[in-house]
């Protein structure tokens, strides 16, 4: 009986530890290299020089444009992830992970953000090597967000 339990546990462990099946079509669609990774550009949005000056309706309009821009970039496949930082002592406000291979291409996108144009945010860009699966976040997020 004990040997049967050991055998069952061993087989269960082997099933858990089995390598996942490689999906060549998915890897190609997401632009993955042989490690399942790809180059992105990481953008840190920081508090800009005009942040404190923009108030009321003007601020609301800038942020409405900021969020619309995020949605557009995500829908176009140019943005893997975006989101705000919690309170911190670095003036970091948010991040973007752009699905573009160069800093120059990312800069062309970030300067279109209404909050950057208005001086609410300034930005820093750097190349970042991460999982190509990052490109599945937007679709998954849409299934998690409750409709308004």
Would you name each region that the model predicts?
Residues 18-148:
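Conserved, structured core segments of small domains
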Residues 10-18:
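Hydrophobic h-region of N-terminal signal peptides that target proteins for export
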Residues 2-10:
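Sec-dependent signal peptide recognition
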């Amino acid at each position: 009986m004990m040997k049967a339990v050991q055998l069952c546990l061993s087989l269960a462990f082997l099933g858990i530890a089995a390598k996942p099946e490689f999906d060549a079509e998915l890897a190609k669609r997401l632009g993955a290299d042989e490690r399942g990774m790809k180059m992105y550009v990481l953008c840190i949005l920081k508090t800009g020089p005009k942040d404190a000056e923009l108030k009321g309706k003007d601020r609301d309009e800038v942020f409405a444009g900021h969020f619309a821009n995020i949605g557009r970039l995500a829908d176009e496949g140019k943005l893997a992830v975006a989101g705000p930082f919690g309170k911190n002592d670095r003036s970091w406000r948010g991040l973007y992970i752009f699905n573009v291979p160069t800093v120059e291409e990312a800069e062309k996108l970030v300067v279109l953000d209404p909050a950057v144009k208005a001086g609410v945010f300034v930005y820093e860009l750097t190349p970042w090597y991460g999982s190509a699966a990052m490109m599945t976040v937007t679709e998954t997020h849409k299934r998690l967000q409750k409709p308004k």
